[in-house]
Amino acid sequence: MVMTDPIADFLTRIRNANQAKHEVLEVPASNIKKGIAEILKREGFVKNVEIIEDDKQGVIRVFLKYGSNGEKVITNLKRVSKPGLRVYKKREDLPKVLNGLGIAILSTSEGLLTDKEARQKNVGGEVIAYVW
């Protein structure tokens, strides 16, 4: 089966593993998925991220994070810009997810950034996803 949107697939796998309270998730690697996983780690939404290199494309192992009572750290993930409808925002129009409680992940000329980092660097770009 041909996958038309690997980023949406990655976010859906994280959402499903999170709902099922799995500790670890493995997905096929790509540069943009690695970047998204690193942002989730840096922002505290996941415990750790490992990149496993093999002879093919590699695997990203994501260690999901839960609170002390088992509550989910990631409430939801939403794909914004899709292959059929790209969404671009200027620096002054960058969205705030839940008034700053969540993050927007953007693909910019500076690489993958959160909405806060993009504001600091004064760049806009394609809004990949919202995480809260």
Swiss-Prot record:
The keyword ATP-binding does not apply. PROSITE patterns: RIBOSOMAL_S8 (PS00053). It holds the Pfam family Ribosomal_S8. Gene3D superfamilies: 3.30.1370.30, 3.30.1490.10. Keywords: Ribonucleoprotein, Ribosomal protein, RNA-binding, rRNA-binding. One of its GO terms (molecular function) is rRNA binding. One of the primary rRNA binding proteins, it binds directly to 16S rRNA central domain where it helps coordinate assembly of the platform of the 30S subunit. HAMAP family: Ribosomal_uS8_B. PANTHER family: 40S RIBOSOMAL PROTEIN S15A. Part of the 30S ribosomal subunit. Contacts proteins S5 and S12. This is Small ribosomal subunit protein uS8. It comes from Streptococcus pneumoniae serotype 19F (strain G54).
